């Protein structure tokens, strides 16, 4: 489906609102866009009225008849608050919660499942003897295999989203792609549960079904992940700041960027509520065995088809628009040709502006894009450039592959599963998100203190640097105190270092995600054309795949006695990169947060 002529760039809250005011008065373009949407046959935008859930007294309903653009004086003096969030957006967040709960629940126990053999004296289902310091296990392929396969799984889970985004944007639409992904993921969970039956593990035949289930789980997640967050944000259809009088009599500016930020914080918090579900699976592997540890994720996964069936006729569904992808690649290709491949050339996109092309090629006919389309390409590429800084960041957020729970296996546990502390990552996020949403960010807006998107990402990077430094010091201490010295990983005795010393690494990593990852999702949606949002989100997710690829390169070094540098190397690299990132990109703290206008 092709939309009408591209709209003028809109802005969101912390962008220069004077430009947004000008855009607010271009009603004819917005009306033309609405007519183009209403004329699309088939699975198009749902116009049915929606219930709106309002969780904050400072959030208000976006009643169209009260829309008024703020004046310049109001921009300087009025408080900026988020708008109301449709109920469908919250329900989609719960859909994502169920998918992430099943995904993290299975993934959290996969490290021990792959690395360690069935414990001696255990129950034959993978659980160790009661009171033992032995970790749960099943396949016994060792640490290097476990880390490498974990990285391959992560790599596939974040590469396949590019295909999932293309399928959604160009062929079947986001919602139908989500349904296909859910079906494949369901098959994966069935195979995973069947392969963890004690008789299969005891016969040494658990590897093949586990590998098949991992691949299918990655495929299903790859179709689901890039499309769910854009679909959540599609439910919010107001992209222009406007003035609203609260019941108290106070006039405020309803800030679309603040609304979008709140939606993504809630979305990310529910992802991590789902991740907290792994607490049940790690205790299941330790106390009962892997058949239960994999059954629990499968049970919660059943919520997905039920909730999607309920939401089917209530959602705003954006139809596929292959024309947007085609136009993007045409503009980029012509830019490369016109600049002879010199991507560093100043004014790289000036030569493909419609006026410049018509002047250079007057007999070639009308140009099939507008200046707005060229600007969209520029802004999308800036977002993609920012995403290139995330792979090294991800290496520091929890370490390379499954190295953090492997480190915990060499520490004093006193009955605590070595992969239990991973649950403090989602716990920290669950606590931090409400604090940021309802206390910190409103206080900053009320005090007119700008905490821009680049500042938030930079803070997240620095928190990850500190997290990596802590893990480096913990690993050094393990080597110094282990009975086997610098061969602590394979030592039959653990180092007299409490596993709780890993807690700062998990907490700092979680705090960093609240700033870096959440802002990354915002940028992916807001800086991309409407017909490319899933694709740009998939490119943000692809940064995790690049991180996994870097981890695979480091895999040969993930052995004693080199583990200190496996932690310290990425930490140093991220510290240097963060300085470069801030210097190069801080100017984007104040630029337009441009997205489609549809009011």
Curated annotation (Swiss-Prot):
<keyword id="KW-0813">Transport</keyword>
<feature type="region of interest" description="Disordered">
    <location>
        <begin position="23"/>
        <end position="42"/>
    </location>
</feature>
<keyword id="KW-0812">Transmembrane</keyword>
<dbReference type="Pfam" id="PF00854">
    <property type="entry name" value="PTR2"/>
</dbReference>
<feature type="transmembrane region" description="Helical">
    <location>
        <begin position="204"/>
        <end position="224"/>
    </location>
</feature>
<comment type="similarity">
    <text>Belongs to the major facilitator superfamily. Proton-dependent oligopeptide transporter (POT/PTR) (TC 2.A.17) family.</text>
</comment>
<feature type="transmembrane region" description="Helical">
    <location>
        <begin position="263"/>
        <end position="283"/>
    </location>
</feature>
<dbReference type="GO" id="GO:0016020">
    <property type="term" value="C:membrane"/>
</dbReference>
<dbReference type="InterPro" id="IPR000109">
    <property type="entry name" value="POT_fam"/>
</dbReference>
<feature type="transmembrane region" description="Helical">
    <location>
        <begin position="563"/>
        <end position="583"/>
    </location>
</feature>
<feature type="transmembrane region" description="Helical">
    <location>
        <begin position="386"/>
        <end position="406"/>
    </location>
</feature>
<comment type="function">
    <text>MFS-type transporter; part of the gene cluster that mediates the biosynthesis of UCS1025A, a member of the pyrrolizidinone family that acts as a strong telomerase inhibitor and displays potent antibacterial and antitumor properties. These compounds share a hemiaminal-containing pyrrolizidinone core fused with a gamma-lactone, giving a furopyrrolizidine that is connected to a decalin fragment.</text>
</comment>
<feature type="transmembrane region" description="Helical">
    <location>
        <begin position="178"/>
        <end position="198"/>
    </location>
</feature>
<dbReference type="InterPro" id="IPR036259">
    <property type="entry name" value="MFS_trans_sf"/>
</dbReference>
<keyword id="KW-1133">Transmembrane helix</keyword>
<feature type="transmembrane region" description="Helical">
    <location>
        <begin position="291"/>
        <end position="311"/>
    </location>
</feature>
<feature type="transmembrane region" description="Helical">
    <location>
        <begin position="454"/>
        <end position="474"/>
    </location>
</feature>
<feature type="compositionally biased region" description="Basic and acidic residues">
    <location>
        <begin position="23"/>
        <end position="34"/>
    </location>
</feature>
<keyword id="KW-0472">Membrane</keyword>
<feature type="glycosylation site" description="N-linked (GlcNAc...) asparagine">
    <location>
        <position position="517"/>
    </location>
</feature>
<feature type="transmembrane region" description="Helical">
    <location>
        <begin position="539"/>
        <end position="559"/>
    </location>
</feature>
<keyword id="KW-0325">Glycoprotein</keyword>
<protein>
    <recommendedName>
        <fullName>MFS-type transporter ucsM</fullName>
    </recommendedName>
</protein>
<feature type="transmembrane region" description="Helical">
    <location>
        <begin position="147"/>
        <end position="167"/>
    </location>
</feature>
<dbReference type="GO" id="GO:0022857">
    <property type="term" value="F:transmembrane transporter activity"/>
</dbReference>
<feature type="transmembrane region" description="Helical">
    <location>
        <begin position="424"/>
        <end position="444"/>
    </location>
</feature>
């Amino acid at each position: 489906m092709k939309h009408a002529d591209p709209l003028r760039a809109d802005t969101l809250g912390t962008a220069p609102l004077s430009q947004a005011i000008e855009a607010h008065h271009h009603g004819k373009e917005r009306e033309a866009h609405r007519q183009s949407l209403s004329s699309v046959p088939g699975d198009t935008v749902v116009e049915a009225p929606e219930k709106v859930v309002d969780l904050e007294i400072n959030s208000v309903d976006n009643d169209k008849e009260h829309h008024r653009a703020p004046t310049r004086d109001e921009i300087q003096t009025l408080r900026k608050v988020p708008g109301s969030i449709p109920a469908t957006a919250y329900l989609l967040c719960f859909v994502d919660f169920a998918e992430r709960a099943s995904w993290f629940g299975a993934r959290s126990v996969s490290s021990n499942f792959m690395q360690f053999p069935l414990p001696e004296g255990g129950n034959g289902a993978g659980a160790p003897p009661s009171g033992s310091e032995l970790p749960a296990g099943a396949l016994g392929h060792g640490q290097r295999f476990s880390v490498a396969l974990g990285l391959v799984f992560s790599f596939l889970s974040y590469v396949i989203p590019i295909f999932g985004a293309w399928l959604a944007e160009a062929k079947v639409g986001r919602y139908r792609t989500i349904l296909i992904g859910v079906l494949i993921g369901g098959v994966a969970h069935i195979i995973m549960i069947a392969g963890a039956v004690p008789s299969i593990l005891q016969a040494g035949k658990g590897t093949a079904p586990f590998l098949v289930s991992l691949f299918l789980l990655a495929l299903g997640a790859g179709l689901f992940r890039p499309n769910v967050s854009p679909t959540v944000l599609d439910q919010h259809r107001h992209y222009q700041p406007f003035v609203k009088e609260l019941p108290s009599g106070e006039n405020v500016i309803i800030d679309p960027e603040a609304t979008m930020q709140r939606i993504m914080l809630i979305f990310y918090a529910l992802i991590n509520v789902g991740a907290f579900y792994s607490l049940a699976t790690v205790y299941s592997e330790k106390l009962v065995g892997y058949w239960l540890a994999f059954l629990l994720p499968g049970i919660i996964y059943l919520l997905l088809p039920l909730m999607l069936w309920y939401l089917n006729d209530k959602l705003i569904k954006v139809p596929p628009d292959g024309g947007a992808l085609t136009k993007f690649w045409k503009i980029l290709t012509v830019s490369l040709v016109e600049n002879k491949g010199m991507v560093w050339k100043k004014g790289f996109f000036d030569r493909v502006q419609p006026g410049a092309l018509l002047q250079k090629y007057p007999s070639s006919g009308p140009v099939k894009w507008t200046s707005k389309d060229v600007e969209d390409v520029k802004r999308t590429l800036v977002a993609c450039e920012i995403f290139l800084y995330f792979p090294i960041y991800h290496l520091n957020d929890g370490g390379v592959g499954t190295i953090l729970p492997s480190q915990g296996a060499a520490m004093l546990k006193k009955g605590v599963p070595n992969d239990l502390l991973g649950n403090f990552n989602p716990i920290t996020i669950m606590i931090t998100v409400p604090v940021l949403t309802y206390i910190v960010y409103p206080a900053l807006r009320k005090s007119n203190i700008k905490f821009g998107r680049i500042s938030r990402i930079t803070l997240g990077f620095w928190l990850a640097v500190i997290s990596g430094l802590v893990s480096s010091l913990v690993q050094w201490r393990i080597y110094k105190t282990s009975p086997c010295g610098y061969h602590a990983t394979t030592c039959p005795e653990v180092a007299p270092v409490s596993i709780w010393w890993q807690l700062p690494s998990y907490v700092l990593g979680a705090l960093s995600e609240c700033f870096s990852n959440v802002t990354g999702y915002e940028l992916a949606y807001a800086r991309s054309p409407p017909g490319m949002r899933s694709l740009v989100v998939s490119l943000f997710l692809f940064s995790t795949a690049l991180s996994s690829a870097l981890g695979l390169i480091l895999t040969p070094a993930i052995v004693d006695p080199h583990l200190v540098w496996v932690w310290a190397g990425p930490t140093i690299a991220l510290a240097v990169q963060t300085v470069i990132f801030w210097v190069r990109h801080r100017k984007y703290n104040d630029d337009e947060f441009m997205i489609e206008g549809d009011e």
